[in-house]
Amino acid sequence: MKKTILITGCSSGIGLDAARGMRDRGWRVFAACRQQRDCDRMRAEGFDSPLIDYTKPDTIAAGLDQVLTATGGTLDALFNNGAHGLPG
């Protein structure tokens, strides 16, 4: 069975590169993005892509539920990369 990882902040930069790299290494990657259009783009690349926006707690809960439902309640790794490039 493939190992699973949830990576936040996959719209661009480090998160996007990490998602592609982990997929290339055989992991099942849940590539979370803040905007629906980015999730759609990631899905077109073959990723599972939950919508998770750290400023909207309901998306965090829904996104995590989506991931845990898809994996049977387990996750091997988390890379909390989201919003590292945002000021504030």
What is the role of each PLM region?
Residues 45-58:
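Rossmann-fold cofactor-recognition segment
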Residues 15-16:
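N-terminal Rossmann-fold NAD(P) dinucleotide-binding loop
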Residues 25-40:
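Conserved glycine-rich Rossmann-like NAD(P)H-binding loop of the short-chain dehydrogenase/reductase
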Residues 55-70:
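Conserved Rossmann-fold cofactor-binding substructure of NAD(P)-dependent oxidoreductases
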Residues 22:
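Aromatic pocket-lining residues of Rossmann-like dinucleotide-binding sites
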Residues 11-12:
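Conserved glycine-rich cofactor-binding loop
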Residues 8, 75-83:
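Rossmann-fold scaffold of SDR-type NAD(P)-dependent oxidoreductases
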Residues 85-88:
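Conserved mid-core segment of classical short-chain dehydrogenase/reductases
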